[in-house]
Curated annotation (Swiss-Prot):
SUPFAM superfamilies: Ribosomal protein L1. The keyword Ribosomal protein applies. It comes from the Bacteria. It comes from Xanthomonas oryzae pv. oryzae (strain KACC10331 / KXO85). Gene3D superfamilies: 3.30.190.20, 3.40.50.790. This is Large ribosomal subunit protein uL1.
Length: 232
C-alpha cells in the first residue's frame, strides 16, 4: 500500500477530534501497517509545560518493560578495573578510556548508546563536538553517566528509551514494534507516562499530560483516551 493510501486509510478510520481507547488506536495503526519492514510504534506526548523556561524542560529515561525490539550497541568509558569489568560482563560492545576516545575520533561511532562513569567524564568531555550532535553524549539526567556502569548497560540493552521536550513541549519516543502484542505496547506506554508524571516540574500548572498520540513509522497519529490506561 503506498504511503499516501495508508495515510488516507488511517485518516478515514479516525474521527476528527476523537480520542480512542488504546487497543482501538493500536488496531487502527496495525490494520494500515503494510510496510516491507517491521514498523515502530511511536508516541507523542504533549505536556503542560513551557519548554522555553529552563525549569520546565522535561528530560529523562525509562526502561520499557517489554523492551523496544531493537538490538542496542553500547560503548562505556570506565577506568580499567572493577567498573570496566562490570560493563563488559553486562554486555557492552566496547569499554575503555583514552583508547576508546581515540577509536571514536578515528571514526568508530557504531554505537547506539555511550555510557560513562563520573571519573571518566574528563575523557568524554573532549568528545563533546563528536558525540553531542549524534545524541550520544553521556548525561546523568538520562542515566548514561553512572557509577554503576553494569546496571546502565543492562538498562540500555533491555529497552531503555530517552526523552526530552522539544520546542513545542512534546515528547517523542518509541514504545516498541508493530509486531508486539497490544499488552506489551500498552505496558511500555504506561511505564513511559508514569515516569513522565514523576518528572513533572514543580512550576508546571494545569493539565500536565495534555495529549497522547500513537503512530506507526510511516503513518499519522491517533489520539489515545488516557482513561483507557492505568496511570497509578
Amino acid at each position: 500500500m503506498a504511503q499516501s493510501k495508508r495515510v488516507k486509510a488511517i485518516a478515514a478510520a479516525v474521527a476528527p477530534g476523537k480520542a480512542y481507547a488504546f487497543e482501538d488506536a493500536i488496531k487502527i495503526l496495525k490494520t494500515a501497517t503494510k510496510a516491507k519492514f517491521v514498523e515502530s510504534i511511536d508516541v507523542a506526548v504533549r505536556l503542560g509545560v513551557d519548554a522555553k523556561k529552563s525549569d520546565q524542560q522535561v528530560r529523562g529515561s525509562t526502561v520499557l518493560p517489554a523492551g523496544t525490539g531493537k538490538s542496542v550497541r553500547v560503548a562505556v568509558f570506565a577506568p580499567a578495573g572493577a567498573k570496566a569489568d562490570e560493563a563488559l560482563a553486562a554486555g557492552a560492545e566496547a569499554v575503555g578510556m583514552d583508547d576508546l576516545a581515540e577509536k571514536m575520533q578515528a571514526g568508530d561511532l557504531s554505537y547506539d548508546v555511550v555510557i560513562a562513569t563520573p571519573d571518566a567524564m574528563r575523557v568524554v568531555g573532549k568528545l563533546g563536538t563528536l558525540l553531542g550532535p549524534r545524541g550520544l553524549m553521556p548525561n546523568p539526567k538520562v542515566g548514561t553517566v553512572s557509577a554503576n556502569p553494569g546496571e546502565a548497560v543492562k538498562n540500555a540493552k533491555s529497552g531503555q528509551v530517552r526523552y526530552r521536550t522539544d520546542k513545542a513541549s512534546i515528547i517523542h519516543c518509541t514504545i516498541g514494534k508493530a509486531s508486539f502484542d497490544d499488552e506489551a505496547l500498552k505496558s511500555n506506554l504506561q511505564a513511559l507516562l508514569l515516569d513522565l508524571v514523576k518528572a513533572k516540574p514543580a512550576t508546571s500548572k494545569g493539565t500536565y499530560l495534555q495529549k497522547v498520540s500513537v503512530s506507526s513509522t510511516m503513518g499519522p497519529g491517533v489520539t489515545v483516551d488516557q482513561s483507557s490506561l492505568s496511570l497509578k
